[in-house]
Amino acid sequence: MMGEAVYEVATRLFDASDLRALYAIEEACFEPAVRFSRSLMRSLAHDPNCRTWLGIVDNVRVGFAMVGLRGDEDASAAYIWTIEVLPAFRRMGVARALLMRVEESTREAGCAAMELHVSERNADGVALYEAAEYVRMGVEAEYYGRGEDAFRYRKAIL
């Protein structure tokens, strides 16, 4: 399944039967030092102010996105906690499909903007967000620890 093919990606909201798949995707995507803990993932997945969307190709869960809904004094904003795709399915439209679904669902929920952090070392993530017209708002030093900074992005979606 390698290459630059673009798959037809279905998206759907998380349900409790997906939790093990989320753990497996997280383990495939990140080294232990930077993974979300299982308890944090479980908490976010079940949080009523968080939406977890799955990316599915040929009935296989190949990625997911977690977004938190929150409000501030000016407008409602959503925060993308993570978008993760199994390595064998990267650069094939899965992350883009998840990002589009997240934007659509948060816009429907009344959110005016999306915000996120992405590692300065994550060139594919940076390219994804910039292609989707996210604006780099700054750099947060040591955001991920170990000398790894994060770019902070924001996009108006209303």
Language model segments and positions:
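Active-site acidic-Proline motif in GNAT/NAT acetyltransferases
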Residues: 86-92, 120-121
